[in-house]
Each structure stands twice: as C-alpha cells, then as structure tokens.
C-alpha cells in the first residue's frame, strides 16, 4: 500500500473514532448521561479515547465510566456534580 493511501486510511480511522454517533441517550436518577457511540473496533483504550473526545459535547459533566457492549459499541457515562 502506498504511503499516501496509508496516511489517508489512518486519518479516516481517527475521524471515525473522534466523532461517535450518539444512538441512545438516557438520564439516570443521579443526573447521569449514557452516551452510546459506534466506533470501528471497541476495546477499552479506544472506548476511553472516544469518551475523552466526546467530553466537549458534555461540558460540565465528568466521565464516570466507559465500556464496550460489543465489538463496535462504546458506552460513556457522564455525570454532573462531584
């Protein structure tokens, strides 16, 4: 594979990881938000990175937890308060 094509593929993967599509949003009684996003390959580190990049959308909330429910779905829990 050509270097230019490889760089383009790498940038495409980064763009897909940085812009998860929120498919489900639910509030819990503790005023927490479960942000569900699709990423290419969901592992603990890629899910954490995806949640870290989506913090800009959830300003004023702290990341409480994150996990993968299957190979492509990442859950990020953002809560208000301490």
Curated annotation (Swiss-Prot):
One of its GO terms (biological process) is defense response to fungus. The keyword Secreted applies. Keywords: Antimicrobial, Disulfide bond, Fungicide, Plant defense, Secreted, Signal. One of its GO terms (cellular component) is extracellular region. Coiled coil: none annotated. Disulfide bonds join 32-79, 42-68, 47-74, 51-76. The keyword Signal applies. Residues 1-26 form the signal peptide. It is found in: Secreted. Belongs to the DEFL family. This is Putative defensin-like protein 134.
């Amino acid at each position: 594979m050509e270097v230019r094509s490889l760089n383009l593929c790498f940038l495409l993967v980064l763009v897909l990881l940085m812009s998860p599509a929120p498919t489900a949003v639910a509030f819990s009684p503790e005023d927490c938000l479960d942000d569900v996003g699709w990423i290419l390959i969901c592992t603990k580190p890629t899910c954490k990175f995806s949640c870290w990049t989506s913090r800009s959308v959830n300003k004023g909330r702290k990341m409480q937890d994150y996990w993968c429910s299957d190979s492509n779905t990442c859950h990020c829990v953002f809560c208000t308060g301490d």
